[in-house]
Amino acid sequence: SAASDVYKRQGVAVLGAAYYFLRKIPYTGRIAVWFTGITLAVCILFCLVNIKISKCIAFYGGWDCGMVANSARWLYEGQTLGYDDYYTIYSNNIPVTWLLYQLYSFASGLKGYPYNPEFIWIQFQCVMLSLAVFCSVLLVLQVSRNLGISVIALVFQSIFLGISPWKIIPYTDGSTIAMPILILLLYSLFRKNGRKRKYLLWFLIMFLGCLGGIMKATCYVTLIAVVLVDLVWSAWEEVPMRKRLQKTGLKILLL
């Protein structure tokens, strides 16, 4: 409609103006800390709004997400899953079933929890969505060092992930949605940190990649991409071959 077109143009104009003025602000450590704090506050608000919306649109899903949700409830009730062919075929759903069971048990034992224990699954996924937005914006800030681009990233990430239906579906997609971008953010920090922190960051990258990968193969894809890119970077470094091989060997050992 004509009204919606006007709103779209106004939104684009506001974003364009924000980008124009913010890109002129010089990037400093203080500015980065300030912007990170604002982004964190926006992401917390984003999480609370998502939880509020989810209370109005939540429903029971079928197919795989229904299977893992039912299994989590059965485990809490003391039932056994037996030798179900489902988990033999889709073994990647075993970890997410265990995760949902732990969350369900926590909510059930929490005095004064105001919702059905199953709602904690949705709350957890809203937190993961907010973490994905936060990590995405920080990654853009790290790479671009430009506040204008980072603000645009914050707006678009909030919109696109805000309308994501996965927040109300307790399944692997929502539970691991922040993992790939978190891995990329850690690798960006890895490239910029000194020697002492590098191997700790590398270990975290490998750990999170494998932790997410047992539930969603996308995390393995991200991890493989990071390793390949790092091998290329290592090949370009102007250091003696022996030192280069030692660093590569230690990274492989951590992997």
List where the protein language model places each region:
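Short acidic/glycine- and proline-prone juxtamembrane loop motifs at membrane-interface regions
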Residues: 166-176
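Short, small-residue-biased leader/transition segments that mark boundaries at the very start
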Residues: 2-7
